[in-house]
Amino acid sequence: MLPAQYRMTRSTEFGATVSRGTRAAQPDLVLYTLRSDETGEPGPRVGLIVSKAVGNAVVRHRVSRRLRHAARGILERLDSRDRVVIRALPRSRDAGTQRFEQELHTALDRIHARTITARNGAPS
């Protein structure tokens, strides 16, 4: 389970992260990250988007639980100002926690590589 202090709950945070954040797509999910300028709430914040396209309520809740569990594994890699949104794709209904963990780490690696390249002034 993802501790409450790390959960993203405000719609404005979700919207800002998805619209202005860096995106990395994987087969089962899309990861959006944004480094927040605000210092109000400590710790990285993680939000989930699991739409009806994934399946019925039972399937969506199962996917959400697996994603929350997998998200715990990336918390130590995040800065306290990071905001992360994980969007489950329809294919995620068949994915297990280990596959989610692998895809989250891969997506985070891609985003970190992209932001480091952008900071150094090289084209991305």
Swiss-Prot record:
Coiled coil: none annotated. One of its GO terms (biological process) is tRNA 5'-leader removal. Its EC number is 3.1.26.5. Keywords: Endonuclease, Hydrolase, Nuclease, RNA-binding, tRNA processing. One of its GO terms (molecular function) is ribonuclease P activity. GO terms for cellular component: ribonuclease P complex. The keyword Ribonucleoprotein does not apply. It comes from the Bacteria. It catalyses: Endonucleolytic cleavage of RNA, removing 5'-extranucleotides from tRNA precursor. HAMAP family: RNase_P. Consists of a catalytic RNA component (M1 or rnpB) and a protein subunit. Belongs to the RnpA family. RNaseP catalyzes the removal of the 5'-leader sequence from pre-tRNA to produce the mature 5'-terminus. It can also cleave other RNA substrates such as 4.5S RNA. The protein component plays an auxiliary but essential role in vivo by binding to the 5'-leader sequence and broadening the substrate specificity of the ribozyme. This is Ribonuclease P protein component.
